[in-house]
Swiss-Prot record:
Residues 848-864 have a biased composition (Low complexity). Zn(2+) binds at residues 892, 894, 903-904. Its cofactor is Zn(2+). Transmembrane segments: none annotated. It comes from the Bacteria. It is an enzyme of class 7 (translocase). InterPro entries: Helicase_ATP-bd, Helicase_C-like, P-loop_NTPase, SEC_C_motif, SecA, SecA_CS, SecA_DEAD, SecA_motor_DEAD. The gene is secA. It catalyses: ATP + H2O + cellular proteinSide 1 = ADP + phosphate + cellular proteinSide 2. The keyword Cell membrane applies. This is Protein translocase subunit SecA. The lineage of its organism: Bacteria, Pseudomonadati, Pseudomonadota, Alphaproteobacteria, Rhodobacterales. ATP binds at residues 89, 107-111, 502.
Length: 908
């Protein structure tokens, strides 16, 4: 019997159906234009691009231009790649242009879809960013789709880590730029730490298309991008505390797996106090409850979390003596990403590797706030519908499910639930053997490296050939995925989200052709391609007969979306396929979210060992549990965003102020206003408003002006004059300070003084912002306790955060005024002394290098030393103008072999 909702949808259609229907006339227009654009020669396509640009400049809207631009882009792709966009791909492109998320199933050609709205929006000349989840995909898509843009007379660039600055500038200057979400965010932060406009890479945030948008804007939403610098080394403390943690017993602590939190019981606190007193970490008279113990308690908590909540080969792996985190959503290693607040150091102590110092935040931004900078945003994914509410509420993005080009023929089976993990794995191995025997390729999804390797051992015992794809094998990722659709292939993989390479039934022709040419370079490429295409076609026929790709998941993820992504690997482009989930009551999701009740029910049903329960009701109850988790995670992200918005508003204010300063050649007016404000504050402090002259502290005002402004004034004499009030003194002090700074500018030269003011202003802003970020972090960590006093932590954070921001601006004015008042040109003697110091240090460095070149016994793990060379042509040590303009990380022109920043760069 159909429910009322189902009947209503059948009669009136769903909102999604209506959206799809609304763009069909546009698709018809594009199709009608196809013959006209096919008739153009290659130069004609480029001429159309120029024509479109002129029409936009004349005021025509992108929406009006869409049918022609899409028709031109479709024809460009057909000629460049031999790929013609289907009607469903045109729909996906239209929804992206309108600022929606296009939900398109695996194999529907999302990479090609992005070229359509990217081309249209790039016609404005403002640049378009296409965002991918990893560097491999950014490079691949830029190279592949770059041919389409070139066919249309557009430029395409790619941004990757460790790129030369000139390459990065060129990539961002291109019409369409491919980049990862991480690199875009970090470049935004780096740009806002630069001191010259010409050094900045990004040229604004006009339009972005985010591939795997759910992964980036939902899964990664809480991940802050942080540029940091080293702080005080506390490695001994981490090591000592790490030795104490294994001594704890279960009665000493509690763990909440749902919130991933830990806390100590009273027994645990007593035990720790005794141990820490004995180790000398906690002074005898000091308790763990004392305010002075906050840091130690924090370290102990992080040590416990490292041991009890973070498992090796699940949340992280140890590689080359480093703890490398694993992305729980994609199964990839994330080198360079570190846990904050000492947790990463606690993991390093646990694993006995080198403990790197904690870092101080220099600049940070979350993906939520970075991507909200764009004027327009679009996204693509195979699975977004389950998170539609979050996309709409946080980012203002609608989700549209785009119909597949061909109907999906995949058979999604009901979950099979076993009582124990061992029973589940026995059933999985049996199912894999059956599928392998009939030649059906099978993709087995696991949630951790540990489980993927355990299953691999079971299959080895049964002599089943297979491949394993997890964070350890990420270098062979493309090859393993390309082989996963071969006849009888068995592939065990951790999460497949964002893998980027489609699993093609029968094998991947392009990958096999490349392999064959690498093995026999002298062979005829055309003959090899013809032979391989025939072999793959025959294999595909056999695979289809065997039932297509079988996706077998060994566990449910917290998010339905991740499960759907794994399922979506099968049944691409109308191919047959099959998917099934094998679960046990001991799985994390089942255990944490109430498997005890289900276990009792199954026991009462008389379930025998090795038997599975399969029923749609079980599926529904599991999906409800997942929906609860998703809802809770959404609430957490929403609350965190409210807190982050406080910092984000301040960040935007500071960054826009920096930009204004960089765009201004002469900042004298800004520094003068700061100086006058400092003087006003000092006058108010020492000559209170509406006070009598005998209440004035004129001597204090004189000393404060001399110290903080640098000007030696006659304020004591002025105060003795008849009829003088605080306003007259204020005006005279401002005038005296202006004359003082004008005389200083004459000493330096006006141009030099302007440059000094600008650099000093930017440096001080950066320093104050860093200090402010640290203060906000501390406030954020304690403000939650205000809830116990019936005060709203968010409102408290907003109020105090604003007060701290105002205080930072006051401090900024005082510091800039103070520094400008104290600077002076070096005397000739001081310049000579500085040059002598440089020469002495240079001689010492050269002597050290000479000693280093003598034969030395080999040392295990010794790093490569810097290469020494001869000084650059024209280099004169005492004349910095002959040093050229090396970058901070370039070799020093003196020939020492050191980086410039560690050599002569220290004196510039």
């Amino acid at each position: 019997m159909l429910g009322l909702g189902t009947i209503t949808k059948k009669v009136f259609g769903t909102p999604n159906d209506r959206k799809v229907k609304s763009v069909r006339p546009l698709v018809a227009k594009i199709n009608a234009l196809e013959p006209e654009f096919q008739a153009l020669d290659d130069a004609g396509l480029i001429a159309k691009t120029e024509e479109f640009k002129q029409r936009i400049a004349a005021g025509e809207s992108l929406d009006d231009l869409l049918p022609e631009a899409f028709a031109n882009a479709r024809e460009g792709a057909r000629r460049a790649l031999g790929l013609r966009a289907f009607d469903t791909q045109l729909m996906g492109g239209i929804f992206l242009h309108q600022g929606n998320i296009s939900e398109m199933k695996t194999g529907e050609g999302k990479t090609l879809v992005a070229t359509l709205p990217a081309y249209l929006n790039a016609l404005t000349g403002k640049g378009v960013h296409i965002v991918t989840v990893n560097d491999y995909l950014a490079r691949r898509d830029a190279e592949w789709m770059g041919k389409v843009y070139a066919q249309l007379g557009m430029t395409c660039g790619v941004v990757v880590p460790f790129q030369q600055e000139d390459e990065k500038h060129a990539a961002y200057a291109a019409d369409i730029t491919y980049a990862t979400n991480n690199e875009l965010g970090f470049d935004y932060l780096r740009d806002n730490m630069k001191s010259e406009l010409s050094q900045m890479s990004q040229r604004g945030h006009h339009y972005a298309i985010v591939d795997e948008v759910d992964s980036i804007l939902i899964d990664e939403a809480r991940t802050p991008l942080i540029i940091s610098g080293p702080s005080q080394d506390k490695s001994d403390l981490y090591v000592t505390i790490d030795k104490v943690i294994p001594e704890l017993v279960e009665e000493h602590y509690t763990i909440d797996e749902k919130t991933r939190g830990v806390s100590f019981t009273d027994e645990g606190n007593e035990f720790l106090e005794d141990r820490l007193h004995a180790l000398g970490i906690l002074p005898e008279e000091q308790s763990l409850y004392d305010p002075e113990s906050t840091t130690i308690v924090h370290h102990i908590n992080q040590g416990l979390r490292a041991h009890k909540l973070f498992n090796k080969d699940q949340q992280y792996i140890v590689r080359n003596g480093e703890v490398v985190l694993i992305d729980e959503f994609t199964g990839r290693m994330t080198p360079g990403r570190r846990l904050s607040e000492g947790l990463h150091q606690a993991l390093e102590a646990k694993e006995g590797v080198e403990i790197k110092p904690e870092n101080v935040t220099l600049a940070s931004v979350t993906f939520q706030n970075y991507f909200r900078l764009y004027d327009k945003l679009g996204g693509m994914t195979g699975t977004a519908a389950t998170e539609a509410e979050e996309f709409a509420e946080i980012y203002g993005l609608g989700v549209v499910e785009v119909p597949t080009n061909r109907p999906i023929q995949r058979e999604d089976e009901h979950d099979q639930i076993y009582r124990t993990v061992q029973e589940k794995f026995d059933a999985i191995v049996k199912t894999i053997k059956e599928a392998h025997a009939k030649g059906q390729p099978i993709l087995v999804g696991t949630t951790s490296i540990e489980k993927s390797e355990y299953l691999s051992q079971l299959l080895k015992k049964e002599d089943v050939p297979h491949n394993v794809l997890n964070a350890r094998q990420h270098e062979q990722e493309a090859q393993i995925v390309a082989d996963a659709g071969k006849l009888g292939a068995v592939t065990i993989a951790t999460n497949m989200a964002g893998r980027g390479t489609d699993i093609q039934l029968g094998g991947n022709v392009e990958m096999r052709v490349l392999q064959a040419l690498a093995e026999t370079p002298e062979a005829n490429p055309d003959e090899i391609r013809t032979r391989i295409e025939a072999e793959v076609a025959e294999n595909k026929r056999k695979v289809l007969e065997a039932g297509g790709l079988f996706v077998l998941a060994t566990e449910r993820h917290e998010s339905r979306r991740i499960d759907n992504q794994l399922r979506g690997r099968s049944g691409r482009q109308g191919d047959p396929g099959r998917s099934a989930f094998f679960l046990s009551l001991e799985d994390d999701l089942m255990r944490i979210f109430g498997s005890e009740r289900l276990d009792k029910v199954l026991s009462s049903l008389g379930m025998k060992e090795g038997e599975a329960i399969v029923h749609p009701w079980v599926n529904k109850s599991l999906e409800k549990a997942q929906a609860k988790v998703e809802g809770r995670n959404f609430d957490i992200r929403k609350q965190l965003l409210k807190f982050d918005d406080v910092m984000n508003d301040q960040r935007k204010t500071i960054f826009s102020q920096r930009m204004e300063i960089m765009e201004t050649d002469d900042v004298a007016e800004i520094t003068r206003d700061m100086r006058h404000q400092v003087i006003n504050d000092l006058v108010d402090e020492f000559i209170p408003p509406k006070s009598y002259a005998d209440q004035w502290n004129v001597e204090g005002l004189y000393a404060a002006i001399l110290e903080k402004v640098g000007a030696d004034t006659d304020v004591i004499k002025w105060a003795e004059e008849e009829g003088v009030d605080d306003e007259i003194i204020r005006e005279r002090l401002e005038k005296a300070s202006d004359e003082f700074m004008a005389a200083k500018a004459a000493q330096f030269g006006v141009e030099n003084m302007r440059r000094i003011e600008k650099q000093l202003l930017l440096q001080t802003i950066d320093q104050k912002w860093r200090e402010h970020l640290l203060t906000l972090e501390h406030l954020r960590s304690v403000v939650g306790f205000r809830g116990y006093a019936q005060r709203d932590p968010l409102n408290e954070y907003k109020t105090e955060g604003f007060q701290l921001f105002e205080s930072m601006l006051d401090s900024l004015r005082v510091d800039v005024t103070d520094k400008l008042g104290k600077i002076r040109p070096l005397t000739e003697e001081e310049q000579q002394a500085m040059m002598r110091q440089i020469a002495a240090q240079q001689a010492a460095a050269q002597a050290a290098n000479e000693a280093a070149r003598q034969p030395q016994p080999a040392m295990a793990g010794a790093g490569a030393e810097a290469e020494e060379g001869t000084p650059a042509e024209g280099f004169v040590e005492s004349d910095p103008t002959t040093w050229g303009n090396p970058g901070r990380n370039d070799r020093c022109p003196c020939g020492s072999g050191k980086k410039f920043k560690h050599c002569h760069g220290r004196y510039t």
